């Protein structure tokens, strides 16, 4: 049975480039969210900025803070991960967790738009940062908690 991962908050970020349809990018983001979490349960912020060559970019930030919604998001996310992606994240947990206890995952934005959740190390991604609760709050404890969450039956 998979362990339960507890978190203080979850932050999701992606970029909308001038060549992309904002509605499609937002649909890709929705792929990560369970139906039980409504948009009013998530703090969204959109920031307009420019790329290196002056091209317009929208930065979309979403944050989940309430424990009930965090729990639902994490349960849903684990269910969306393929066995291969869970294995990959388990094997790379040391490098995907920082000293502050944040677990970083990147998902392929194009595949998410098609309804598929796929871990990616590419550039065109949806960034998910999970601020994990662990005791003691040390990297080793967070890595252990993340690995326990990733383990288990389908």
Swiss-Prot record:
Keyword tags: RNA-binding
Domain of life: Archaea
Pfam families tied to this protein: RNA_binding
InterPro entries for this protein: PAB1135-like, Ribosomal_uL5_dom_sf
Gene Ontology MF terms: RNA binding
Record bears the keyword Transmembrane: no
Subunit comment: Homodimer in solution.
Function text: In vitro, binds efficiently double-stranded RNAs in a non-sequence specific manner.
Protein name as annotated: RNA-binding protein PAB1135
Source organism per UniProt: Pyrococcus abyssi (strain GE5 / Orsay)
């Amino acid at each position: 049975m998979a362990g339960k991962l507890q978190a203080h908050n979850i932050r999701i970020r992606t970029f909308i480039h001038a060549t992309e349809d904002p509605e499609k990018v937002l649909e890709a983001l929705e792929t990560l969210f369970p139906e039980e979490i409504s948009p009013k349960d998530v703090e969204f912020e959109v920031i307009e900025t420019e790329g290196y060559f002056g091209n317009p970019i929208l930065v979309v930030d979403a944050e989940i803070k309430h424990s009930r919604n965090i729990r639902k998001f994490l349960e849903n996310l684990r269910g969306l991960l393929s066995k291969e992606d869970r294995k990959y994240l388990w094997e790379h947990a040391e490098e995907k967790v920082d000293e502050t206890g944040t677990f970083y995952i990147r998902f392929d934005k194009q595949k998410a738009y098609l309804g598929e959740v796929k871990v990616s190390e590419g550039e065109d991604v949806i960034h998910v940062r999970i601020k994990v609760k662990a005791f003691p709050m040390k990297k080793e404890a967070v890595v252990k908690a993340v690995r326990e969450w990733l383990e288990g039956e389908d």
